[in-house]
Amino acid sequence: MKYFYIVTNRFKDPDGVNTRKIAHFLRSKGAECVCQIEQEKAFNKTGSYSDVRLVPNNTECVIVLGGDGTLIQASRELSEKDIPFIGVNIGTLGYLTDTDMSSFEETLESLLRDDYEIDRRMMLDGCIYRGEERIFSDMALNDVVINRNGALRIIDFDIYVNGEYLNTYSADGVIVSTATGSTAYSLSAGGPIIQPTARLIMVTPICPHSLNQRSIIFAADDEIMIEMKDNKSSSGRMTGSLKNDSARVATFDGESFCEVVTGDRIVITQSERISRFVKTSRISFLERIRNKM
């Protein structure tokens, strides 16, 4: 690799010290490197960490400084470029980032001599329908989450798989995740840890009001449809403003969201796009899990 683009979480590297350190190292080795924070100074751009319009067409690798969240946001926003990503963690080593600032030189040396592997991660497409109209669509690397929006009550919904009714749930919400997302919100909700390159779709209810409702794993090419129902199980117990607050929300990777109402259908399928992560670290996925225990 010779052509690099650096995306920086400005909250974790506010002065750009780490960004400049990486850029200087790459340039000293004869590589070409463009930093988004330098572009922002030139074009006075603010907002999200990454902007697909600013990425040069000859970029071979996007280096993301921050944490797992920054890497997820960059992979979503730059997915149309089909460029591999590598994460440099500023803080505690996560599940997705490959290295940190203490060992970045060794990692970049591996990239420069083409000594690396590519992990291909499945993504999800989600569409929200109100009647026959599609009102919202987005993609997710980790998960699509449907839960309550403020009110302290459970929500009711039906789940269909490939058009076949699965079950009716009363819960705080539901998480539809990829294998990559199995170590995110789904794990906190009691879901299993899954090898991240596995191709599948996992459905995990959030605090279900039943003892026998657990995570279910489906094939990658299955279609998951969630239909929102009236919150009958909780409406009788609610009074005042909470009773009138029926807002529920669908969130994609914690980044974008859309409020949903009774009758809305959220259809989730495997995306045609994938995220490609560069892997140079000798730390295996199992070792990362072991270090978290």
From Swiss-Prot:
One of its GO terms (biological process) is NADP biosynthetic process. One of its GO terms (molecular function) is NAD+ kinase activity. The active site is at D68 (proton acceptor). Its EC number is 2.7.1.23. It catalyses: NAD(+) + ATP = ADP + NADP(+) + H(+). Its main location: cytoplasm. It holds the Pfam family NAD_kinase. Keywords: ATP-binding, Cytoplasm, Kinase, NAD, NADP, Nucleotide-binding, Transferase. NAD(+) binds at D68, G69, N142, D143, R153, D172, T183, A184, Y185, S186, L187, S188. The keyword Kinase applies. GO terms for cellular component: cytoplasm. Its cofactor is a divalent metal cation. It comes from the Bacteria. It is found in: Cytoplasm. Involved in the regulation of the intracellular balance of NAD and NADP, and is a key enzyme in the biosynthesis of NADP. Catalyzes specifically the phosphorylation on 2'-hydroxyl of the adenosine moiety of NAD to yield NADP. Belongs to the NAD kinase family. This is NAD kinase. It comes from Lachnospira eligens (strain ATCC 27750 / DSM 3376 / VPI C15-48 / C15-B4).
